[in-house]
């Protein structure tokens, strides 16, 4: 409901955290519709493959639902992010889930996958190292009457994923400072001014 979502946004304590017009200024949105390749690439739905425990996954979303359903359905390994989410939700609704995203053990598995994905994809790792803005996660869509309507995701539920990504970034930046190589990666924010901010009609 547009009015309900707008009220949620209006009442938010930190509106800048939820405003796509400020992405690249106050934050990077980890979302398939992010303005930046970093935000898109860090999304679980991104089709960025990785190997873990001698197995290959086409997307982190596939790994997510492969774990939630007890590692029984190997077809998740070859699915795109959106395919995995669609099939995974159906299986969970049918009672195939053996755990959930609140389970600490499950969260550790996803963190391992996040580390593998970032480590094995140099371009994504480089972009992460170059960035300095906080990582956020929210959805939005264009509302009526030329006004944005926001569908707000409960960020606290998935903040543990963003925390892991930021932890990786901090460790890599610290290591590169120690070896004097960080200067070869100018901050991503220096490049953002070249990108035109989107206009919502």
Spell out what each predicted region is:
Residues 1-199:
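Charged, low-complexity intrinsically disordered segments
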